[in-house]
Amino acid sequence: MTAPASAPRLAQARRIVIKIGSALLVDSANASLRLEWLQSVCADIADLRSRGAEVIVVSSGAISLARHRLGLTSRRLRLDEKQAMASVGQIGLAQGWSAALAGHDLVAAQLLLTPDDTENRERHLNARATLQTLLDLGCVPVINENDAIATGEIRFGDNDRLGARVAQMTGADCLVLLSDIDGLYTADPRQDPSARHIPVVEQMTDEIMAMGGEPPPGYSSGGMRTKLLAARIATRAGANMVIAAGQEHHPLRRLQNGGLCTWFMAQTDAGSARKRWIGGSLQPKGTLTIDAGARRALEESASLLPAGVTGLEGSFGRGDLVLIRDADGSIIGRGLIAYDSEESQKLIGHRSGEMEQLLGYRGRDALIHRDDLALDLP
């Protein structure tokens, strides 16, 4: 568990998801945002953006902001009360992020997600496409769990795992968990003075997972255990993950400058992880037959456009898996389709510019985006 020569660096990442917990963002004394701290984080984000990185924020804090304002601080909240607190606090949280990012000429965009948005294929495609468009427009998406509607049975439960799912969904190459601790230790350093800091974790073994404990008291619903669960998700999806202390101003700058932290090494790259999932974990619902020109385009890593599709079989919904067959009848790949079978039938053989006339609305140009393709070409 010693640092390898090629230990990752934040400056090397091109798409970064940053998770920030309630205890860092909300001042427990007066239940308000730590505005100077938040402004320093946004300055760090602006610096990362200036270096060419795309940044997505996963931010807790809505419930913590609201429960003090509404006088519900002395007892554990019921689920319906948490949902009400989220509705109240989310407004102030979004306003705080918007103002702080605007100070660096950055535009904030708010998204509230539930597990279904990352696990249901159709909603997954919608959420990912929205995030990609926001990044293309130069925005900084600020994401939180949609606590106002999520139930106990269908919720992430903590934003560490939400951050990992967002990293997985967007193909991020780095997930940063800013915390009240500077990484993983062999034991809880607050209770065991002999605990040793672990700078790099190369494999998520049972021994590593056993180092997680119960969540500490206070605002945060997460603890080291949830961070290790997030690390397992993120590293399997091809993202490096880092746990770093975030209490002081400019925590990302300090991380870039070599501050104490723990890196969890990606077990693959994001593209390969996604293509393995598409290629081997789902059952196909239909088949598209393509012409020679479309095959050549796929060989050059292009998306599958409707003009190159000559035939369609099966009944499928948006986000379902379909097989791709070339003109010789060979199955050359599979992918997640952006339209259902009825709409796809209307589109095949037509140019993307005709989509609006054919469907009555302007949809996505590709039947299958290149990121949703897993090819098996000879």
UniProtKB/Swiss-Prot annotation:
Enzymatic reactions: L-glutamate + ATP = L-glutamyl 5-phosphate + ADP
EC assignment: 2.7.2.11
Species per Swiss-Prot/TrEMBL record: Gluconobacter oxydans (strain 621H) (Gluconobacter suboxydans)
Positions of substrate binding: S60, D147, N159
Record family assignment: Belongs to the glutamate 5-kinase family.
Keyword Transcription: no
Binding site residues for ATP: K19, S179, D180, S221, G222, G223, M224, R225, T226, K227
Entry keyword Lipid metabolism: no
A GO cellular component annotation in the UniProt record: cytosol
CDD domains: AAK_G5K_ProB, PUA_G5K
The protein's role, per its UniProt record: Catalyzes the transfer of a phosphate group to glutamate to form L-glutamate 5-phosphate.
NCBIfam families: proB (TIGR01027)
PROSITE patterns in UniProt: PUA
Gene Ontology biological process terms, A to Z: L-proline biosynthetic process
Localization per record: Cytoplasm
Protein known as: Glutamate 5-kinase
PUA domain boundaries: 285-362
